[in-house]
Amino acid sequence: MIEKQKRKELLILNVLKNTEMPLTSTRIAEELKQLGHEMSERTVRLYLSRLDEDGLTTSSGKKGHHITERGISEFDLAKIFERVGF
């Protein structure tokens, strides 16, 4: 089972994976809320900062963030492990 922090990172990566354009933390928080996951803009920003450091997302300044190829691979791999039950 994936720990709480990793699950939140995967939720953010999922939102970014499903869009072509960069998204701001505000927009990501709104998308997560629509999916039934409450997360504040500040929390999203903190996770995005960590994801940027890990190379899973990149910042486009005030335009927002987008997922990298590495982020897509990480997301897909995590989903496979989650389905298998590791």
Stretch-by-stretch model annotation:
Residues 72-86:
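Short, amphipathic alpha-helical interaction segments positioned at domain boundaries
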Residues 1-19:
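Short alpha-helical segments that sit at the start of domains
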Residues 30, 34, 52-53:
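Alpha-helical residues within the helix-turn-helix
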Residues 22-32:
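Short acidic, hydrophobic short linear motifs in intrinsically disordered regions
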Residues 37-52:
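Short amphipathic alpha-helical interaction segments
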